[in-house]
Amino acid sequence: MRVGSRLAVDVGKARIGLARSDPHGLIATPVETVPRDAAGSADVRRILEVAAEIDCTELVVGLPLALSGRATASTDDAEGFARRLADATEIRVRLVDERLSTVSAQGALRASGRGSRKQKPVIDQVAAVIILQHALETERAAGSPPGALVPRNRVDPDRHA
């Protein structure tokens, strides 16, 4: 298991949920919900601020695939957002399968007694926790990083993957 805090990113149309791991990759905890900025880059800037605050070594972006494994419009959106993050930072960015993370988050919140109206502010954070916890468990079991590394568009000879 690699050492270093990871920051999970659950990309939604209106909001982006963030969750972080401890440096040893044992547990994921919610951080905050960032408003989506479709017209600008305030969302990317905020995510990178949080990453710097926690001394993040990797960004884990959830990749929403259909149950069949096929790409959807949300898949394309998450991939585009992951590329924007990768182009804006030296931190590694990985795309990790997140099928059913939002459904699992809704179920967990409902089981904890939160109705659908009370879920809205935290649902994206809980989904990010589920994405990150799954990624951490997958890495522990497989012995290698989960998902796919997102390449950067600009060439930087000092960057190490």
Curated annotation (Swiss-Prot):
Keyword Nuclease found: yes
Keyword Nuclease: yes
SS bond list: none
GO cellular component: cytosol
Top-level lineage group: Bacteria
One Pfam family hit: RuvX
Main location: cytoplasm
Keyword line: Cytoplasm, Hydrolase, Nuclease, Ribosome biogenesis
Name of the protein described by the UniProt record: Putative pre-16S rRNA nuclease
Cited NCBIfam families: RNAse_H_YqgF
